[in-house]
């Protein structure tokens, strides 16, 4: 980039730079769709195939593990990755990117992505809090991000909120209810449909209790032999943990750590909420984040693109990321701003101009 061009970009407002980024994203999307016309022609079918293929893959891995064909670690890793595809599908469905003229098919796909990720709120409720997130990202009434620790100072409480849904409900729930009560009251979707999440949590905490008990016996040098009546329960919990509980927890923990830290929460200098697309997110594509990205489909490196253009399927966002990332950097979106994580995700500005430095 020439010095003159860099100077012109620096002189742009956030709105102007955001508009440039949107143009580049849409340009890259058009190039892909023109080169591969099937992407547009079969977009609905692609979404359905990914949904059913991912769910079917999780079932297949479970069967292979139960049949003692694949080890536990392989089942956990592959199922966790497949569950991350289902999360991306839910996200696309929230923005009606597939079967927008068929509520029946959309609802069927919503059911699939929910049943195979039972530790989440139902997708109809999440749709409303996610669309709210796009309107108020970086504000105190951003229910979706604050619930997973965005804006919290680093410490034990934040770690617990990122990793444990019950801790999130206990620690963040009262604050969010206070700060976003009008928005929560406007939500029409039912919060509870079937007790899927509660059932998941019952199984999950039972497994954790069993594991801690076994660990305690091991540390004490005592052989852990469950009574005969408990043995089938232990076997069931261990199997459920490998095929469903741990993969779902891994996926959820990974995306909550990444998402809560790639979104900014307020402007540290002006103590104001963020209303600029350029300042809402950063790009996390450091190798340090790779283990987490394995279970959240490279979320930190590409989700910022979605904030600029919401009507792009996740696989096209990934496909076009190498092209679009250059525009994000050029127009001032920050990269790997780990310093913000030590400042409760506050957006730090440089000097009086308040323009982002490009890392």
Positions of PLM-derived features:
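Non-catalytic, topology-defining segments of multipass membrane proteins
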Residues: 1-82, 89, 115-249, 311-359
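Long helical/loop segments within the catalytic core of UDP-sugar-dependent glycosyltransferases
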Residues: 81, 291-300
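Conserved, well-structured beta-alpha core segment at the onset of a catalytic domain
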Residues: 84-88, 104-107
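Histidine-centered catalytic micro-motifs
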Residues: 86-96, 126-138, 258-267, 299-313
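Transmembrane helix-loop junctions in multipass membrane proteins, especially transporters and channels
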Residues: 92-96, 100, 213, 217-224, ...
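Juxtamembrane helix-capping/reentrant segments at transmembrane boundaries
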Residues: 98-118, 145-154, 272-289
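Transmembrane alpha-helix/helix-exit interface in multi-pass inner-membrane proteins
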Residues: 170-172, 252-269
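Active/binding-pocket-proximal capping segment
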Residues: 264-277, 321-326
């Amino acid at each position: 980039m020439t010095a003159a061009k860099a100077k012109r970009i620096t002189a742009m407002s956030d709105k102007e730079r955001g508009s440039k980024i949107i143009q580049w994203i849409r340009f890259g999307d058009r190039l892909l769709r023109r080169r591969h016309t099937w992407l547009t022609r079969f977009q609905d079918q692609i979404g359905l195939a990914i949904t059913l293929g991912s769910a079917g893959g999780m079932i297949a891995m479970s069967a292979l593990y139960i049949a003692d064909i694949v080890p536990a670690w392989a089942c956990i890793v592959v199922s966790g990755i497949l569950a991350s595809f289902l999360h991306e599908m839910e996200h696309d469905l929230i923005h009606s990117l597939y079967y927008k003229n068929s509520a029946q098919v959309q609802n069927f796909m919503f059911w699939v992505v929910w049943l195979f990720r039972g530790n989440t709120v139902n997708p109809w409720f999440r749709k409303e809090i996610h669309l709210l997130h796009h309107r108020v990202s970086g504000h105190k009434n951003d229910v979706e991000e604050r619930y997973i620790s965005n804006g919290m100072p680093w410490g034990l409480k934040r770690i617990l909120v990122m990793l444990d849904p019950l801790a999130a409900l206990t620690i963040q729930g009262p604050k969010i209810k206070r700060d976003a009560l009008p928005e929560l009251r406007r939500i029409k979707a039912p919060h509870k449909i079937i007790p899927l999440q509660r059932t998941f949590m019952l199984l999950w905490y039972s497994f954790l209790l069993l594991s801690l008990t076994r660990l305690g016996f091991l540390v004490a040098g005592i052989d852990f032999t469950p009574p005969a009546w408990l043995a089938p329960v232990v076997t069931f919990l261990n199997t459920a943990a490998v095929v469903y509980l741990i993969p779902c927890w891994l996926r959820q923990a990974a995306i909550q750590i990444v998402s809560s830290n790639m979104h900014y929460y307020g402007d540290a200098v002006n103590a104001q909420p963020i209303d600029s697309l350029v300042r809402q997110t950063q790009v996390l594509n450091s190798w340090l984040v790779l283990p987490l990205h394995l279970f959240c489909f490279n979320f930190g490196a590409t989700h910022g693109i979605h904030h600029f253009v919401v009507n792009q399927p996740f696989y096209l966002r990934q496909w076009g990321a190498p092209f679009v990332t250059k525009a994000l950097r050029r127009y001032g979106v920050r990269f790997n701003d780990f310093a913000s994580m030590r400042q409760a995700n506050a957006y730090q500005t440089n000097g009086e101009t308040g323009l982002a430095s490009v890392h």
